[in-house]
Amino acid sequence: MDTAERLDLVTRHTTEVVTEDELRTLFEESDPSAYIGYAPTGEMHIGHFTTMRKLADFLRAGVDVTVLIADLHAHLDDNKSPFDLLDARSAYYETAIEGMIEAAGADPEDVTFVRGTDFQLDEEYTLEMYRMAAETTISRTQRAASEVVRESESPNLGGLIYPLMQTLDVKALDADIAYGGVDQRGIYMLSREILPDHGGESPICLFAPLLSGLSGGKMSASDEASKVNLTDSPDEVDEKINQAYCPAGEVEENGVLEYLQHLVFPVLDVRGDSFVVERPEEYGGDLTYESYDEVESDFVSGELHPADLKPSAASAISDVIDPVRERLADKDELLAEAYPEKYGAE
């Protein structure tokens, strides 16, 4: 695979690359490494899957991939995960992410998993964090983390430490590429700015899109109707997609279309499959699509009606998450330990 092919593979389905010239040079000169970090807080859902799916592209392009389970970050961000649940939630995240990587057509054994507590308490890391804290203003760290950590009129100190640690993680994990959702952009721009003054190099940054919720607007972790969970049954997926905001001809904030664009079609492409919308012959018969653009074009023109799109979209989404669902099917004890209030640990 030549540089152009690797570059295309790694950058497709992203919202921004900072910068593409740096990434091209990196591929020409070395076999790069990339990392993504996830703080183990609430249950993972399909929004996470669109980001994790990209790791399969990194692997195919010959990139070494590390997944950081940022357990300390989960506690620092307004105690989203109590300290005594960090280990259980970290184990759950590892299992769920392995399933998502497998569902995307890659081998989770090819990915290195690391927890924050494996290295973030080391003396060298801690001393460098103190140096960074002494040289970075409160307003700069707040601006960097504004799209990630929970904000309030009286924020906890943990939310200020959070972006500094995330910056140091790039150096500690020896990552050439920092990958994450576009909400992470502020933190990684801080990393590019200050990391060279702390013994590291400015990371190349790739950002994934954030999906709209199924009810329109932003996807909310607290709104079950706004997202498909990785453990949802096929019937639950059908119900959520059937009730989703999907007005005829409208693309803006249409979660059903975004699921197809950023998750279903990339996975179908790897599998060599098409997306089929089943329709009665009296309404024109089945429609077969090889690309998302074809779906959007027919949807906007009115050729494809939401009533026909939704059942087929639900079936395709359910099929994509099935390997993850199966991996978690016999993990009742793990879920109960990670989320005792919901699953009732005995």
Curated annotation (Swiss-Prot):
Q: Which family does it belong to?
A: Belongs to the class-I aminoacyl-tRNA synthetase family. TyrS type 3 subfamily.
Q: Which GO terms describe its biological process?
A: tyrosyl-tRNA aminoacylation
Q: Which domain of life is it from?
A: Archaea
GO CC terms for this protein? cytoplasm
Give the originating organism. Haloarcula marismortui (strain ATCC 43049 / DSM 3752 / JCM 8966 / VKM B-1809)
Q: How does it assemble?
A: Homodimer.
* Annotated compartments: Cytoplasm
User: What's its catalytic activity?
Assistant: tRNA(Tyr) + L-tyrosine + ATP = L-tyrosyl-tRNA(Tyr) + AMP + diphosphate + H(+)
Q: Which NCBIfam families match?
A: PRK08560.1 (NF006330), tyrS (TIGR00234)
Main location as per UniProt: cytoplasm
Give the enzyme's main class according to its UniProt record, as a single word: ligase
Q: Which GO terms describe its molecular function?
A: ATP binding; tyrosine-tRNA ligase activity
The sequence motif named 'HIGH' region is recorded at 40-48
What does this gene product do?
Catalyzes the attachment of tyrosine to tRNA(Tyr) in a two-step reaction: tyrosine is first activated by ATP to form Tyr-AMP and then transferred to the acceptor end of tRNA(Tyr).
Entry keyword set: Aminoacyl-tRNA synthetase, ATP-binding, Cytoplasm, Ligase, Nucleotide-binding, Protein biosynthesis
What EC number(s) has UniProt assigned to this enzyme? Answer: 6.1.1.1
What name does UniProt use for this protein? Tyrosine--tRNA ligase
Question: Which SUPFAM superfamilies does the protein's record reference?
Answer: Nucleotidylyl transferase
Q: Where does L-tyrosine bind?
A: Y35, Y162, Q166, D169, Q184
